[in-house]
Amino acid sequence: MAVISMKELLEAGVHFGHQTRRWDPKMDEYIFTERNGIHIIDLQKTVKLVDEAYNFMRNASTDGANFLFVGTKKQASDAIAEEAARAGQYFINHRWLGGTLTNWNTIKTRIQRLKDLEAMAEDGTFEQLPKKEVVLLNKQREKLNKFLGGIKDMPGLPDVLFVVDPKKEEIAVKEANMLNIPVVAMIDTNANPEVVDVKIPANDDAIRAVRLITAKMADAIIEGRQGQDSAPEDAFVAGDENTESIEEIANIVEEGNN
């Protein structure tokens, strides 16, 4: 059984790549065809590679790995935060601060500052300070929470990065590569797949597509933590004899563009 069916991928628009003029030639093996100037991703390969990514995430989770979900563009921001939290993991969904991984010790000092400010807000310290100072401290707390709130409880460097759009998150991927932290990523037709360890060829600009893939990666982590007998409901889908072939999908796409 596959983790995600071809039909689910199609309905979420996972097959739509970028304009052909924006492609990265290294993605050629994951492209099925071109329709009206748009590359169409080979969903038969995506189905298999989602399975591989799911197994990788599940196995790492079983081994106790910590995961950092990264996706800062608006199409990914909500799904990244919600699915990481559902899996009990960590996330960055607004802006990647350079050095988050490679200068972790400095980042930890900013996280501690955030925690200190939160404690001050809760223990009544703010009530004893001048209002102007409290306003400034609250602004600082809000800014730190925006960028670091998703990793404030991360015990150390993550063991695995899950990334939506490694082209957009180039700095995060480079830092992970430098530290030999494996990267699992949704990768569109405009990006270089060679910087990613576990590839999921997919439309990384559609909210539904991002949500679908990200949720399955969260399912994998949950299953790994709980064990095979407690796999998330509907984590796997039965093979659908009526699922469209990739040729039929291409025709559907072409008809939809006419």
Swiss-Prot record:
Alphabetized InterPro entries for the sequence: Ribosomal_uS2, Ribosomal_uS2_bac/mit/plastid, Ribosomal_uS2_CS, Ribosomal_uS2_flav_dom_sf
Gene Ontology BP term (one): translation
Species annotation: Leuconostoc citreum (strain KM20)
Similarity field: Belongs to the universal ribosomal protein uS2 family.
Source lineage: Bacteria, Bacillati, Bacillota, Bacilli, Lactobacillales
Gene name of this polypeptide: rpsB
Domain of life: Bacteria
Gene Ontology annotations for the cellular component aspect, listed alphabetically: cytosolic small ribosomal subunit
CDD domains the UniProt entry points to: RPS2 (cd01425)
Record-linked NCBIfam families: rpsB_bact
Keywords tagged on the record: Ribonucleoprotein, Ribosomal protein
HAMAP family to which the protein is assigned, alphabetical: Ribosomal_uS2_B
GO molecular-function terms, A-Z: structural constituent of ribosome
Protein name: Small ribosomal subunit protein uS2
